[in-house]
């Protein structure tokens, strides 16, 4: 919505996808965006294969991979859960969703495209592995803490610029097992079997010291 407002370019095309559950009032879906959607005909809502917009569905990944393969100049990912009763474990709980968002982004990202994704704490092996993966796939990776984000809030944004890959299909196929277990309660402990370079881990520790 912000990018659409700033660019004011009717030739742009925006695709939005989020979880839709009409039986759960805690899932906002697009209820608060009706006016925005009415006023911007170049914004399209994607519900994917199962019509729920669930990013943890393998069928939905395959659907979006086929439909939008290597077509997106800019991808943003701002998904999350309600952590109001369990702030201390939001990094672990969100790990699978964050990884799924990264996989979706890789599946649709155009070469030289950019990706913006929200992380929370970045202390666990899983988080460091995901950041290392992004550093391999994009030319430049930056951490950003917006002025509007409270200091006590662990959220931070990772800006990834200049996607390196011409074709990501083979890589995406290797991530299919991540989607085999549909439970959001199954957390990701690590991604790589190899050891992440110590220099990279050291840089993440420095960033954690700055942002907390």
Predicted regions, residues:
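Beta-strand cores of modular interaction/reader domains in eukaryotic scaffold and signaling proteins
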Residues: 13-15, 76, 116-118, 142, ...
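Beta-strand elements of modular eukaryotic interaction domains
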Residues: 3-5, 65-66, 104-107, 131-133, ...
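Class I S-adenosyl-L-methionine
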Residues: 129, 133-183
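Flexible, glycine-/basic-rich loop-and-beta segments that form/coincide
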Residues: 160-212
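The AdoMet/dcAdoMet-binding core of the Class I SAM-like
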Residues: 1-83, 88-100, 123
